[in-house]
Amino acid sequence: GGGGLAAGLALACPDTAIHVVEPEGWDMVGRALANGEIVHVGDDPPSTICDALQPDATKPINLAVLSGRAEPGVTVTDEEVRAAQRFAFARLNLVAEPGGAAALAAALAGKAPVDEDTVILLTGGNTDPASFAATLVDT
């Protein structure tokens, strides 16, 4: 969390539209981009299954790289993330941790544009086996 992956993509792929996807209530990068300044998490942030996407704030270097380069931020719900995890497992034979499935969740929920040139990063298999099993059976 904090925009490091998005900033790295922006540097590596300068002619590419970058869509930052974060869990609801933890959209510090998206809000920082919208406000033009660092935004910190509130005193009582909501819970989320996306534990890898829970920064206190974005880093100044990430905001500097992404400013003027990234599209408006997108947020996803835990249920949208679970649906993406199920999709990745059933259709792609991949195990994705919740935070790693956030971009796929945004695409599947219609919150981020998808066309023939879209690349969705599906990262991380570091997920609790019991939680992942519960996600798979919860349809």
Feature-to-residue mapping (PLM):
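PLP-dependent amino-acid enzyme catalytic core
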Residues: 1-139
